[in-house]
Amino acid sequence: PAVAADAWRRYRAGERGDVLTSVMEFASYQAPQVLQDDWEALLAVASEDEVQLATQVWQGLPSATAAHWAQILAEADDDREMARARALLLAAQPETYAIARGYLVDWGRLDAEVWAHWAGVAEGPQPRRLHGERPLHFRFGREQHRAQQADEPSWRKRTWRLHPTWNGGQVHHAGRMGGPLEALCGGCHAPLQRLLQTYAAALQPGASGEITLGLCLDCCGWEDPPVRFYRHDADGLPTCHPSQHRAVPSTPTDSGDLMRAEVGLVALESARWQQQDWGQSNHRQNLSRVGGAPSWVQSAWYPACIDCGEEMPFVMQLDSTLPTTGEGTLLWGSGGMLYTFWCAKCRVSGHFWQCT
C-alpha cells in the first residue's frame, strides 16, 4: 500500500510516466482502498484513458457520492460526463444504475447490452449480477502441474511456485478433469470431454448433488455455432442441445484429449485475487477458476440461454495452461481463455472461448 499511496500522490500532483501508470493499474487491483480517498481525482484519472483501472475500484463508491453524480448526469445535456457515467455504471448501485445506463445509451456509441456486460450485469433498468465475487482457483494435479511447467523458463517456474493463485489457499471442493463422457458432440458426434466434475454448490450456491461440465474441444470455437450449449440431467450430466445437433457429422481438427486429473477448488483469503486481468497476468497468475469475475481476453459478453433467452451467469474460466494426453497444451485458439456459463433455471451450460 505504501508504494501505491506514493504513486497516487505523485499522479495527483501531475506526474506522468509508464512506470507510474503501471503502478496505478496494479494498485487498482491490489490496494483499491488507497485510490478511494478522492473520488473526483480518481474520476479525472479515468477520464484520461491512460490508466486502465480495475472495475472493482468503483464498487466502493459511497452512496452519497453516487447520488450526487447521478444528479449531475440527469442535468447534463452533452457527452462530457461519459467518464462519470461509466464509473457510476460500474458501481452498479440499484438507486443510480438506471441514470448511468440512460446517459450512456443516449450519449455513447455502444448499445445498452455492451455497457451492461462491461459492468458484469444483465441488460435492463436494474442491475442483475452475472458473476459472483468469491472465485475458487483450480489447484491442478501433480501430473498436470508437471506438464504445465515442462517447457517453461526457470523464472516462470519460480513465479508459479511462489504465487498464491497457484499454490495458496484452502481446498473447498474436490473435482475431476479429463476423460470422455457418454454424451456425444452434436457437431462431430465424438464423445464430449470432461472439463470439470464437482459439487454443484461450487457453481450454484445452495445447489445439491454433482455437476459435470463437458465440451467438445474439437468443435468449440472452430465450428459454428460459436457458443456450445448443453442440457444437464438430474445427475448433472450434459447432453448436446437438440438445436445444435447435425445429422451429418463435421470433421474438425483434433485438439487433443484433456489429461485426466484429480483437482481442488481453492479459496484464497486475500481480496486481491477476486478480480484478475488477463493482460496484466501475462501468464504469471493462475487464471483458471470457478466463479468470481471473468478475465476477458476481448470484450465482455454473457450469452443468452438457448432455452429461456436470459443472460447466463458466468461460472468458470480455463486458461490456456491445460495439458493434453499427447504432451501438448490446450490453447483455446492462441493463448486464449474458455468461458463457461450456467442457467440454473433451465439447467443449461454454455461455453465459448476468446483469444488474441
Model-derived regions, located:
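Preference for intrinsically disordered or flexible, low-complexity segments
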Residues: 1-356
